[in-house]
A protein has these predicted regions:
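Cytoplasmic helix-loop-helix junction between adjacent transmembrane helices
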Residues: 113-150
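Helix-to-loop junctions at the C-terminal end of transmembrane segments
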Residues: 68-80, 266-279, 363
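Juxtamembrane intracellular "pre-TM" segments in multi-pass secondary transporters
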Residues: 1-16, 192-221
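Symmetry-related core transmembrane helices of the 12-TM Major Facilitator Superfamily/SLC fold
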Residues: 172-188, 372-387
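Structural signature of the two symmetry-related core transmembrane helices
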Residues: 83-97, 281-295
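Interfacial helix-cap and linker-helix signal at transmembrane-aqueous boundaries
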Residues: 43-44, 75-76, 163-166, 241-242, ...
């Protein structure tokens, strides 16, 4: 098994060189995600803001993701993707620096909104880069490798962010800005002058207009509901573990790191093991595990129970995420890739807008346990939507 996995990870074997280049870019960029992981704690613990205010501020970031996802898709149909990506990385460096310096709520809201726009656009553009620089047969493999790279970066970000936050929360912002600058330099060095592959219009069902593509619309609905449930991990889990499980900031950081490390270790072998299930059953089983992992949090105590919860919902994440993104790429091959990717990531980004508000209000009014019961219910609601989206998949 280990020998087979080693063969898969050879630079010029199963994955193309460009898949490795884009995965490395995503890894470096994800190191700056420590800001997202610890933003809720920073706003509440360092700045002393109410939990409801924290929810509204994080929703500003979510609103930016929503706008940026669609804007990035639209712009990528008119501006060279590499040039647009580099410009967004450059602006992001300064936004992250400013987030660590300002303390007024209106300025924080504006900067979080702008940061969300940038992150949403970059997320969409990364998918476009895979389509532009990878052959059709290699795109799903590039997706898998990018997912491992993303979580490897998140693991490092969670651990490093926890250590930096213990010393001074502002170091989290400055380190994130430095990592974003490094991502920009890597991107310019490896991709700027690389020729784009000629991508032809490919359509699996003859439909090239997203609003008329019914399976794609079901996918958008399932994506939005799943996203709202899953985003509570980023918007609420840190404060919940501090308030109800009494974990330290560093222990919370290690919890995020555990999630990412599990994905790194299990994603590729797990994806191969369930490959014959098809997209539908991978997503359905993953959703059930996600609901169980999040829904069990109110019924236990102690670090070991939290780790068990993390293990279960991480397995669910590892099962439903890859087919979700591969399905989006399949629909995007209809020739309107910018529109499809924009709408898909806009749907996912809606969770970052709605989830902090919903979870913040539930947390403040009914206590932290209600957040995870709501999340589990939403995941279960997504199951029939997923069933409709994956007819024939």
């Amino acid at each position: 098994m280990l020998k087979g996995l080693t063969q898969l990870l050879r630079p010029n074997g199963y994955f193309t060189p460009m898949a490795w280049v884009l995965a490395a870019l995503l890894f470096i960029n994800r190191l700056s995600a420590m800001v997202k992981l610890f933003m809720a704690l920073y706003l509440r613990q360092e700045l002393g803001l109410a939990i409801e205010t924290v929810g509204w501020l994080l929703s500003a970031y979510g609103a930016g993701l929503l706008v940026g996802s669609m804007l990035g898709g639209w712009l990528s149909d008119h501006v060279r993707t590499a040039r647009l990506t580099a410009a967004l990385f450059f602006v992001s460096v300064w936004v992250l620096m400013l987030l660590g310096l300002v303390t007024q709520v209106p300025w924080l809201a504006a900067l979080l909104l702008l940061s969300g726009v940038i992150d949403g656009a970059i997320r969409t553009l990364h998918q476009r880069l895979i389509m532009e620089y990878c052959e059709v047969a290699q795109r799903s493999r590039a997706q898998a490798l990018s997912r491992v790279a993303r979580n490897l970066g998140m693991a490092a970000a969670g651990v490093a962010g926890g250590v930096l936050a213990q010393a001074d929360f502002r170091w989290v912002f400055f380190a994130s800005a430095a990592m974003t600058m490094l991502a920009l330099l890597w991107f310019v060095r490896t991709t700027w002058r690389r020729p784009v592959l000629v991508v032809g219009d490919e359509s699996a069902d003859g439909s090239s207009v997203p609003p008329r593509d019914k399976p794609f619309l079901w996918l958008l609905a399932a994506t939005a509901v799943l996203g709202i449930a899953f985003d509570t991990v980023y918007s609420t889990l840190g404060n919940y573990l501090r308030d109800y499980y009494h974990l330290s900031t560093e222990a919370i950081g290690w919890q995020f790191g555990l999630n990412a490390l599990l994905v790194i270790a299990l994603q590729i072998p797990l994806s191969h093991a369930v490959e014959r299930w098809g997209s539908r059953w991978q997503m359905l089983v993953g959703s059930v595990l996600l609901a169980c992992g999040l829904g069990m949090l109110p019924f236990g105590s102690g670090l070991a129970f939290v780790c068990l919860s993390t293990l279960i919902w991480t397995l669910g994440e590892a099962l439903f995420m890859p087919p979700l993104n591969v399905l989006a790429m399949h629909f995007a091959q209809s020739g309107k890739s910018g529109q499809y990717f924009g709408l898909f990531f806009m749907s996912w980004s809606a969770s970052a807008l709605l989830s902090p508000v919903l979870s913040g209000q539930l947390y403040g009014q009914f206590g932290g346990h209600s957040v995870w019961l709501m999340s589990a219910l939403l995941v279960l609601i997504s199951i029939p939507l997923t069933w409709q989206a994956t007819r024939g998949a």
